[in-house]
Amino acid sequence: IFLQAKERGGDHYDFDAAYAAMQGYYDQFDVNWLNQETLVNDEFAASGYPMFSTPGAITDTLYNLGFRVFSLSNNHSYDKGAAGIEASMAHWAAMPDDVVTMGFYNLSTYDNYAYQTVNGITFGYLSYTEHTNGLPTPSGAEYGVVYLDDRETIAKQIADMRPNCDVLIV
């Protein structure tokens, strides 16, 4: 899809046409969650299988469609190592204030939690992955994923977040 977006955009990536059929659909919902299956950033060249990197322009399109909640923890989270995690986190941090991400956790504390209040309802979000395609937590990484088999960390995160939200989405 990024190759088509580059062809359409010329000197930039234009993802709008790929999602044109969905324009307006998500307006009917108060909360729109998307599992972002690849690292998003402009530090690494766009790449597909087997080590993915998606151009940052995708988030403009997704934002304009109405997505505000993005899960970042998945099997491709470590595709570009610690630098990929940092680049992706920096990209998401530059998004508008109403964007919420979860899935990359501080590896020392695992307590950088994501909350969002919509129509007076506070949502808490957690995101996990089953595996990272055989890639270990990158050396030197400050942030990383929590694996589904890490029941102790997951239980602690759920217990920490429950009192602070009306709805907890895991």
Predicted regions and their residues:
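Acidic, metal/ion-coordinating pockets
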Residues: 1-170
